[in-house]
Amino acid sequence: MTVAPPPLLAAASLSFLRQDEPVFGPLDFELHAGQLALVEGDNGSGKTTLLRVLAGLLHVDAGELRWRGEPLRRDECAGEIVFLGHQLGLKGDLSPRENLRIAAGLHGTCEGTNPERALHDVGLAGYEDEPVRRLSAGQKKRAALARLRLVPATLWLLDEPYANLDRQGIALVNRLLEGHVAAGGAALVTSHGAVSFHGGEPRRIRMHA
């Protein structure tokens, strides 16, 4: 009998406090390879905090995280997780091409990467060498999204990825998500309704403080 693989990511009784006040939790969920999950909740319910916890930028106060069925160890899965938040992680004095090379180096994927192709795929052909500080807000978001094309991470953590994007940019994010999930990846996304996903009904994770 074939044994089903464990969830890619699982949370059990996950809780986070700030100054002894609960931000979210206890929270339980599972996310499998090939799944998209929408993180929903009112403002202040901890959606961004959850993604920062999963990215390893914050530590939970209680609960457990498991990665592929084993207790999550950051040193073992860091290269498999990429986080895109409100702060895009771009250096303003560097070009999109240079920023992508740095991102690839941090993920240990410099060799064989193609920043130019990634920038072309997100609509920034012709802006490869423009200092990021000179780009519009939407172009900066596209430059950050290009990391998703460049870094071979299994799990995408995307916090409001549609912000500052026009209709074409929103469609781009949806295409990136569909392609990633179809290839066996997984994604957790916070959004205010711009998701148009054609790869099946997304999972929904409801946040409560």
What is each of the regions a protein language model found here?
Residues 55:
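Helix-to-loop junction immediately C-terminal to a conserved catalytic motif
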Residues 101, 112-127:
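Conserved ABC ATPase "signature" region
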Residues 93, 131-138:
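Conserved ABC ATPase signature
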Residues 148-149:
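ABC ATPase C-loop
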Residues 156-160:
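Catalytic Walker B motif of ABC-type/P-loop ATPase nucleotide-binding domains
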Residues 63-79:
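Conserved ABC transporter NBD signature motif
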Residues 87, 92-108, 114:
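Q-loop/switch helix immediately C-terminal to the Walker
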Residues 145, 184:
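Hydrophobic anchor residue at the start of the ABC signature
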